[in-house]
């Protein structure tokens, strides 16, 4: 066993003395050491129940003959970090989580790992670590929040952000906003729509790294405690059979995940995280392939914010496996791949029927014949831009309008809320990319302000930043190259005509080559906004959004 390096032999007597200090017995040290990565904390609603999940995992590991040992991972609540400097520190934690988990796993010679994440950057960060360390690993998340109820209708956090915009437009009173505030987030768990956290937990299941129900069983259900116990037991099987993350997360597994992504209508953040996870697994996953998969993969779900169904509804309908079963009817998945169950995808999804065709459309009757996400290209986004097509109003799928240009999120929000943005405009928010932000902030506040003020079907927003999974509308993010490195988005001027054509995957602005070159000559890079601490190091190492904003050591010239 890998842990023999710290538990066996006379040379390891000092190591054993330290295990003795932990209260571990010789009998426990004779068993495999299973690291349980706990993301529990008291600041993230999606993580406040993870202590209970961890205890259940420990019981499962012990029942199956292992010795569970818990160590922590950090996690940020994107909702609490939203709209201020805190959002610069969200995406960057993905890589901190991957790095620190790698360090803990390698330093202590664990035989296997059980990852217990839940929210936005925590899930991909731990998937990246799993691929890097490549010892037997399984995931069990904390589960989604139940939807709130306001006046008898299901609501979620995206409704809350839009209520603030509606108040600014004079469409809601402060008392009505307060009612939303008190009711939209009724339980612990990851926010209740198909936002980033739930997207990544569902895609963990699709990749084969989580058991059935990992992405959809609500946080407050006792079924999730049982799932955690099963995950603890299952890791011992994976260890015995030496099934490792890179055996599971193959190139075909990532193509499966993209297909499920398109069917579910996941957050556009998946287009950042899947390439980054694939990179750690030794797989080159170019975002361009998303359009190829989208062209043949129907969109089957319109969960919030795209529609009025929620994660609890998806769970009742049969969950991720039911969606995969629908896709398999048209041969859209590779089903012979091994998963963390020790079985193939085909074996896993057999008999997992769609129990609610209103939540999961049958593949013969999809919301659209194409997937939920589109990658756009053109002179505005030479490398790529990403949009959640399933959350765009039909009248905005093709749009032409004047650019309203802002060099930071705050200036754009002020303009939107003060009524300076009108129907037909295209809001451009730049210098918010991975380097320029730094940290590629989510533009949920401006998109929610646009929707709340009744402009969601007439105003588009384009940014080199990114969007919360709770954003809806013609919200095009991840524009690459970003403004900070001289991408064309830096050269747009107020009033330039922008042409958006989502069905044809194009994003352009009307400018001659000569004029574009003139503007480029006059452009110069800006000084970094932050020059100390982790964000300064991140700025120096982070790559473009179209590459998943992975980190690379700068080459010495």
From Swiss-Prot:
UniProt pathway: Amino-acid biosynthesis; L-isoleucine biosynthesis; L-isoleucine from 2-oxobutanoate: step 3/4; Amino-acid biosynthesis; L-valine biosynthesis; L-valine from pyruvate: step 3/4
Gene3D superfamilies: IlvD/EDD C-terminal domain-like
Keyword Ligase in record: no
EC number of this enzyme: 4.2.1.9
Cofactor note: Binds 1 [2Fe-2S] cluster per subunit. This cluster acts as a Lewis acid cofactor.
Residues given in the record as [2Fe-2S] cluster binding sites: 119, 191
Listed GO biological process terms: isoleucine biosynthetic process; L-valine biosynthetic process
Magnesium found in the keyword field: yes
CC cofactor: [2Fe-2S] cluster; Mg(2+)
This protein's GO CC annotations: cytosol
SUPFAM superfamilies, sorted: IlvD/EDD N-terminal domain-like, LeuD/IlvD-like
Catalytic residues of the enzyme: 468
GO MF, one annotated term: magnesium ion binding
Binding-site positions, Mg(2+): 78, 120-121, 442
InterPro entries for this protein: Dihydro-acid_dehy_C, DihydroxyA_deHydtase, DiOHA_6PGluconate_deHydtase_CS, ILV_EDD_C, ILV_EDD_N, IlvD/EDD_N
Reactions it catalyzes: (2R)-2,3-dihydroxy-3-methylbutanoate = 3-methyl-2-oxobutanoate + H2O; (2R,3R)-2,3-dihydroxy-3-methylpentanoate = (S)-3-methyl-2-oxopentanoate + H2O
N6-carboxylysine modified-residue sites: 121
NCBIfam families: ilvD (TIGR00110), PRK00911.1 (NF002068)
Family the UniProt entry places it in: Belongs to the IlvD/Edd family.
Purpose of the protein: Functions in the biosynthesis of branched-chain amino acids. Catalyzes the dehydration of (2R,3R)-2,3-dihydroxy-3-methylpentanoate (2,3-dihydroxy-3-methylvalerate) into 2-oxo-3-methylpentanoate (2-oxo-3-methylvalerate) and of (2R)-2,3-dihydroxy-3-methylbutanoate (2,3-dihydroxyisovalerate) into 2-oxo-3-methylbutanoate (2-oxoisovalerate), the penultimate precursor to L-isoleucine and L-valine, respectively.
HAMAP family tied to this protein: IlvD (MF_00012)
Subunit structure: Homodimer.
Protein name per its UniProtKB record: Dihydroxy-acid dehydratase
Gene that specifies this protein: ilvD
């Amino acid at each position: 066993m890998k842990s023999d390096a710290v538990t066996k032999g006379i040379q390891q007597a000092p190591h054993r003395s330290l295990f003795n200090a932990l209260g571990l017995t010789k009998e426990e040290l004779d068993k495999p050491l299973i690291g349980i990565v706990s993301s529990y904390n008291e600041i993230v609603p999606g993580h406040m129940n993870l202590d209970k999940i961890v205890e259940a995992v420990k019981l499962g590991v012990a029942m199956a003959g292992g010795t569970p040992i818990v160590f922590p991972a950090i996690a940020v609540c994107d909702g609490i970090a939203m709209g201020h400097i805190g959002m610069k520190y969200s995406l960057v934690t993905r890589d901190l989580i991957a790095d620190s988990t790698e360090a803990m796993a390698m330093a202590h010679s664990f035989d296997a790992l059980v990852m217990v994440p839940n929210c936005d950057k925590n899930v991909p960060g731990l998937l990246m670590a799993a691929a890097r360390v490549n010892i037997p690993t399984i995931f069990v998340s904390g589960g989604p929040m139940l939807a709130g109820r306001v006046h008898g209708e299901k609501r979620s956090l995206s409704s809350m952000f839009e209520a603030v915009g509606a108040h600014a437009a004079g469409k809601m009173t402060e008392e009505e906003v307060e009612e939303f505030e008190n009711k939209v987030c009724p339980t612990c768990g990851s926010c209740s729509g198909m936002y980033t956290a739930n997207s990544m937990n569902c895609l963990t299941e699709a990749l084969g790294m989580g058991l059935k129900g990992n992405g959809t069983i609500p946080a407050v259900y006792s079924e999730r405690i049982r799932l955690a116990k099963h995950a603890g037991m299952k890791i011992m099987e994976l260890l015995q059979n030496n099934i490792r993350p890179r055996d599971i997360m193959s190139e075909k597994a990532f193509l499966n995940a993209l297909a499920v992504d398109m069917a579910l209508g996941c957050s556009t953040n998946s287009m950042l995280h899947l390439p980054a996870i694939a990179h750690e697994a030794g797989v080159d996953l170019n975002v361009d392939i998303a359009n190829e998969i989208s062209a043949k993969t129907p969109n089957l779900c319109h969960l919030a914010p795209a529609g009025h169904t929620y994660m609890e509804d998806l769970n009742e309908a049969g969950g991720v496996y039911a969606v995969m079963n629908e896709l398999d009817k048209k041969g859209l998945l590779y089903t012979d791949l091994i998963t963390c169950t020790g079985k193939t995808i085909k074996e896993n999804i057999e008999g997992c029927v769609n129990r609610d065709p209103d939540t999961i459309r049958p593949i013969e009757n999809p919301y659209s014949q194409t997937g939920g996400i589109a990658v756009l290209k053109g002179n505005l986004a030479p490398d790529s831009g990403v949009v959640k097509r399933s959350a765009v109003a039909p009248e905005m799928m093709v749009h032409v309008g004047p650019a309203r240009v802002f060099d930071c999120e705050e200036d754009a929000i002020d303009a939107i809320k003060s009524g300076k943005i009108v129907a037909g405009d295209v809001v451009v928010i730049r210098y918010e990319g991975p380097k320029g932000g730094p940290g590629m902030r989510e533009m949920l506040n401006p998109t929610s302000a646009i929707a709340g003020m009744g402009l969601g079907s007439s105003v588009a927003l384009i940014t080199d930043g990114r969007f919360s999974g709770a954003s809806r509308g013609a919200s095009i993010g991840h524009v690459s190259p970003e403004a900070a490195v001289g991408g064309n988005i830096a050269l747009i001027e107020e009033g330039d005509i922008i042409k958006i054509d989502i069905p044809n995957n194009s994003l352009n602005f009307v400018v001659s080559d000569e004029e574009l070159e003139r503007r480029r000559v006059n452009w110069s890079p800006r000084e970094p906004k932050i020059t100390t601490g982790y964000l300064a190091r991140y700025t120096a190492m982070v790559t473009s959004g179209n590459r998943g904003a992975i980190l690379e050591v700068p080459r010495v010239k």
